[in-house]
């Protein structure tokens, strides 16, 4: 079997126009895959220089393969099973700024550089006041980026045509706003002056983005078969689902410079990221949170099996299409398409997503993902959404513990104060006390949910039904 490098595989030389902070599975299977498709299908013609954001990382592994690797997409596409392998050739080189700081800083001197993309984890966009301008490099990602921007400003004497377009991909709501704020903190801490601040404001753009693709990562279980198929000894294969979405809160002139739409990619440039964030939380995370306890207490362990179950499948459909979708303000057809994509993702034959892994911290999840929908539905329709109410009753039942009908032990996991509260309430043996006690817990909900008209009575009725008839019969009663 051949080693994978530029001697054994074709690698096109393209202008270095993108600096990418992060070399992990997600960026390589999402951003670099998107850039590969843009290079193939448009005149984007750009390569990526990867910068390792922390001192330990995968730069050496990448360089050993001349920065070539394969993406293995697996899942359903319009009902068809897809399992494809693509060699990604967009990374020109990978740098470790902790050992190659001069080369890192020289990236700022390249006139063709135009974009910065990052994924340094949720903890990556943070202000560290101990960072100094003369550090080689600054320890934080925003510190390194400020060093780079300041060097570029000086190199080109404040030329406003040499600004950079910055797309953070960290999983933080309004990540661009947070990154920009942190850069301003470094400008002030390091006294970089008003001229630089004005150049940064006017020549550069830091844009909030929302990313969505499940990336399981290195396919340990299938790697021998994959290597056999590609005939390369690729140690950086990364597996991902087919679905991808990148929402970028930026004007159309930025979209023209980053023409992902012309490559047929699901990359949207929008005036506000917020409705898309709300859509994802409501239609992807919201159903996950309620389907998991309903499925588990019905004896179903995997998300895909729950979707395909005769009764639970109808429950999930009801919650998504009849309840949660009714609470969002985006165009109906767009929401329907997104919900159908979500169901296809839940049905992915290659991913065994255990419902128990979703049930960790179910109460806070319900509060952020499902409760807003329950309230909006009540406000708009004048009645409670039965599926979301049953989902809450299922969570409360799950936290009772005990064993399922098949003998499997029920082991809830949440913050100690939530676990203690549920233990005390269930010890009373009274579903009215359990319901009212949970709904009154302001440390969970930020308010007393007993004040929502009819909610306590509806949850109690579902709890009683689950105790008497079991989960499946209770679900059938609301369909």
Swiss-Prot record:
Annotated disulfide bonds: none
Primary enzyme class: oxidoreductase
Molecular function GO terms recorded: mannitol-1-phosphate 5-dehydrogenase activity; tagaturonate reductase activity
InterPro entries membership: 6-PGluconate_DH-like_C_sf, 6PGD_dom2, Altronate_OxRdtase, Mannitol_DH_C, Mannitol_DH_N, NAD(P)-bd_dom_sf
Gene Ontology annotations of biological process type: mannitol catabolic process
The keyword Cytoplasm appears for this protein: no
Signal peptide: none
SUPFAM superfamilies according to UniProt: 6-phosphogluconate dehydrogenase C-terminal domain-like, NAD(P)-binding Rossmann-fold domains
Transmembrane portions of the chain: none
GO cellular component: cytosol
Taxonomic superkingdom: Bacteria
Keywords recorded for this protein, A-Z: NAD, Oxidoreductase
Transcription found in the keyword field: no
EC number, UniProt record: 1.1.1.58
Catalytic activity: D-altronate + NAD(+) = keto-D-tagaturonate + NADH + H(+)
Annotated pathway: Carbohydrate metabolism; pentose and glucuronate interconversion
Annotated positions binding NAD(+): 18-29
HAMAP family hit by this protein: Altron_oxidoreduct (MF_00670)
Family: Belongs to the mannitol dehydrogenase family. UxaB subfamily.
Name of the featured protein: Altronate oxidoreductase
Organism: Bacteroides thetaiotaomicron (strain ATCC 29148 / DSM 2079 / JCM 5827 / CCUG 10774 / NCTC 10582 / VPI-5482 / E50)
